[in-house]
Amino acid sequence: MNELTAFNEQRAEIYWWLSSLLSAELTTEQLEQYGSFEVRTFLSNLAETPELSDSVNALIEKLNAVQGREDAQLELSADFCDAFLGSDKSSALPYASMYLDKSGLLNAKPAQDMREWLTKYNIAQKAEFNEPADHIAIELDFLGNLIVMTNQQVSEDEFEAYMSAQLTFINEQLLSWTPRFNEICIERDKFGFYAAVTGLLVTFLKLDVKFLAGE
């Protein structure tokens, strides 16, 4: 494994991690893991990247605050529901269609576009996650898989084509709406844990675009 493929694996893991945070409420066991040495080391290492430092430290600060809540898991689950599962007037709905399609309806063209990406690369949506294809967690899970597929390409031309596809996907399917999604999450998530997650997501996406574009 060379340095680039190893870095790609790290990128995929980060996208899968962010996908898991935005797909469902954290269980008690998962929340306890966020206090572990392993996870805290992962976050500390991530914060060593200067462009990510502020966003990661904001998330660490919220994690520390979560640990101090009386019923941490239940309260954080309520925060998740308030942040993402309400109406478009009260929550930051995690679907691209809500931000990119004038109809304001779920399962609009952005969802169709996402289904086409899934089909093109033969990546299946997880059967147990029954959400429209343009849910943020599905898009991030897809991106992680696309990065891993990139590492599996044999020729340099194929490898570069897959790297280019990642750049196109991030620009068209994610950065086209996640900054606004993050802004609304900041407004609606009173405790701020999930706003810290979406803030880190947008920061990481912008940094990743620079990497993929060779800047």
Curated annotation (Swiss-Prot):
<dbReference type="InterPro" id="IPR020945">
    <property type="entry name" value="DMSO/NO3_reduct_chaperone"/>
</dbReference>
<protein>
    <recommendedName>
        <fullName>Chaperone protein TorD</fullName>
    </recommendedName>
</protein>
<dbReference type="InterPro" id="IPR023069">
    <property type="entry name" value="Chaperone_TorD"/>
</dbReference>
<keyword id="KW-0963">Cytoplasm</keyword>
<dbReference type="GO" id="GO:0051259">
    <property type="term" value="P:protein complex oligomerization"/>
</dbReference>
<keyword id="KW-0143">Chaperone</keyword>
<dbReference type="Pfam" id="PF02613">
    <property type="entry name" value="Nitrate_red_del"/>
</dbReference>
<dbReference type="InterPro" id="IPR036411">
    <property type="entry name" value="TorD-like_sf"/>
</dbReference>
<comment type="function">
    <text>Involved in the biogenesis of TorA. Acts on TorA before the insertion of the molybdenum cofactor and, as a result, probably favors a conformation of the apoenzyme that is competent for acquiring the cofactor.</text>
</comment>
<dbReference type="GO" id="GO:0006457">
    <property type="term" value="P:protein folding"/>
</dbReference>
<dbReference type="InterPro" id="IPR036386">
    <property type="entry name" value="HscB_C_sf"/>
</dbReference>
<dbReference type="InterPro" id="IPR050289">
    <property type="entry name" value="TorD/DmsD_chaperones"/>
</dbReference>
<dbReference type="GO" id="GO:0005737">
    <property type="term" value="C:cytoplasm"/>
</dbReference>
<comment type="similarity">
    <text>Belongs to the TorD/DmsD family. TorD subfamily.</text>
</comment>
